[in-house]
Amino acid sequence: MTGNDILLWDETLFKDLSVLEPDYLPEYFPHRDSQLNALRFALKPALRGMRPLNCLLVGPPGTGKTSAIMKTFREVEAHAPNVVTVKVNCQIDSTRFAVMSRIYRQLFGISPPNSGIAFRKLFETVVNFLVSSEKVLIVALDDLNYLCCEGHANEVMYSLLRAHEQYPGAKIGVIGIVNDASDLYCLDSRVNSVFLPEEVSFPRYEEGEILDILKDRVRYGFYPKVISDEVLKLVVSYVEKTGDLRVGIDLLRRSGFNAERKGRRMILFEDVEKAYEASKLLHLCRGISLLSDPEKQLLELIAKKDEIKAGELYKSFHELTQLGYTRFYGMVNRLQTLNYVDADFTGKGKRGRTRIIKTKYEAEDILNCLKKA
């Protein structure tokens, strides 16, 4: 290392560190044009003072669902002062009262009383305001499945979707955001008959798309020549392994800090590898924490075996949860989609092909994450 390669104490590799923050919303949103256009079309009636179309955004973690909502909401707010948009994180606001309180705060700028007010009264206050002010409300329920877990999904959805029947002039649209459509198993026929969403799919990013997106973050987040194409491709490979673009953005940030700590002007392979070792369990545990309780129970059963046949696994799962095969089958497919398990078919079963299921991570790592979840 020459003198020119050494980073001085008052120098930094980062041109704009905010570009590498998880909540950064880029001006340009590559490889999601069709999804953004579908959202814009669904929300277009709201700009004319009408109820928008309901939507369901479906895709694995880190595929741009929440960012697409935030970008579209910004556009709507900039062009339609009569439209109020609210994004609810259902991991945090997982009860009907918490959801309605979030909407109330967005409308009135203050929180409702913590006690002494019923859900129905809070809801009436919200809807009466919408009607009297002639505003359109669009509510995005991020991680909607958490309302299912808590048993509040049907009442929240039913109240919002049928508000116009009880309160003429109320105009409310609902956007559900889930990792898999099967997450909405809890919605009953009353809700499904009025939800009827436009489904917008967010598939995993492909290798070339990941590279494009991370190159943009590098261009605006770092000074020139801080990271080589070869090192960036290593970051891309880790994103492919996890299936979560947020992993790549976080790795760029951590790798930059590692290089600065060593006083280098460039990020090396070892900086990325060290960053991944330090953060991979954080990403794994974060993902597992988002699973429903039955999914966590199923993953634990799988992790406690080197590999297990689907029939044997279902028997153990049913004894533990009393859930049926349809739910079990959907959860196995979801865990496979999320890259937590392999569930390959083999021809060695008594009746032909059967599924052999095993974890894609070290079992100990998964079990440790489940303990923290």
Curated annotation (Swiss-Prot):
ATP binds at T63, G64, K65, T66, S67, Y205, R217. Disulfide bonds: none annotated. The keyword Nucleotide-binding applies. GO terms for biological process: DNA replication. GO terms for molecular function: ATP binding. Keywords: ATP-binding, DNA replication, Nucleotide-binding. PANTHER family: CELL DIVISION CONTROL PROTEIN 6 HOMOLOG, CELL DIVISION CONTROL PROTEIN 6-RELATED. Involved in regulation of DNA replication. Belongs to the CDC6/cdc18 family. This is ORC1-type DNA replication protein 2.
